[in-house]
């Protein structure tokens, strides 16, 4: 396998893991700097990886991400998205509460 491709795979996985950790990492960064030469491919692959994340019941072994831990955390995330949009940010994927269909679908899914 090409070393550049392996590096890109690791960088994508790192970005996805830091951005989708539900606040469980004390050192979670808030930005990523992507070189313009690889930006388009990097973002396309990140969005594909993010779209593959299965939300749902934390007790289901197929679930990759459960709900946020509290209403306050969900509201904080929502407020950050709203601020970003108000300041001109473009939402590339998601950006709203997830629609779930199961027993605890009213949980704090985003």
Model-found features: residue ranges?
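ALDH superfamily catalytic-core signature
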Residues: 1-110
């Amino acid at each position: 396998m090409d070393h550049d491709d392996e590096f890109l795979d690791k960088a994508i996985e790192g970005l996805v893991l830091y951005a989708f950790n539900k606040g469980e990492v004390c050192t979670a960064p808030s930005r990523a700097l992507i070189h313009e030469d690889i930006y388009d491919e990097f973002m396309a692959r990140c969005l594909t990886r993010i779209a593959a994340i299965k939300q749902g019941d934390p007790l289901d072994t197929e679930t990759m991400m459960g709900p946020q831990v509290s209403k306050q955390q969900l509201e904080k995330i929502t407020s950050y998205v709203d601020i970003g949009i108000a300041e001109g940010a473009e939402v590339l994927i998601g950006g709203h509460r997830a629609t779930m269909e199961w027993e605890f679908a009213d949980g704090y899914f985003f």
